[in-house]
Amino acid sequence: MLFTDILTMVFETIGTTFLATLFAYVLGLPFGVLLNVTKKTGLKPCGWFSTFVGLIVNVLRSIPCLIIIVICIPVTRALFERGTGEWYTILIPLTVCAFGFVARMVEQSLAEVSAGKIEAAKALGATNFQIITKVLIPEARASLVTGVAVVAVSVLGYTSFAYNIGAGGLISGIYTYYTRHTGDYMSSILFWVLIVLTVLIVQGIQELGMFIAKKIDKRKVVK
């Protein structure tokens, strides 16, 4: 395995994690907002709609990632003219896997916003849309950013299934190396280098998420 191969794995892992997380938030953020707004104590309570959206989210969360990958192969093949063999062929399955998780994370983050601030906005005549865009999301932004980091780490973990469709990445590379060197893989420096690189990426995501969250968190701590 050459240095260029390792570099390719790193870029595949980072690229796949970033894009899948981005797409999952594009889809999951609106659903998370809807879950929060339409619940019993939300801005616009709607029992049947909240139940329906929640059912979609829960069903997607309950399907194992590997099964979703298999189900999505026809869709991936239709879009990319191939269902397996390249790093981008796992983007759609990873997005679907993370979508439900994102929706629940967003719902939870918005639920942390003080009811008093929402009531104050209502008293000032703000519409529901204005409350969502100018109160709920801005007030929950630190929690939302932390959620992004958590989701990104989970998505990176999902890339372990990339091995099953030849989609590449560090975790897939680690398992491939193991299958080809089952007798001496534990004593191989390369094997541990791949593991260390994976850990560094995970730590980088977590630290970046915490750093940004602290920077944008405007809440005052009372001593």
Positions of PLM-derived features:
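Transmembrane alpha-helix signature in integral membrane proteins
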Residues: I6-V37
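Cytoplasmic-entry segments and transmembrane alpha-helices of multi-pass inner-membrane transporters
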Residues: L34-C72, L94, R104-Q108
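Short helix-to-coil transition segments within interhelical loops
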Residues: L110-A140, A167
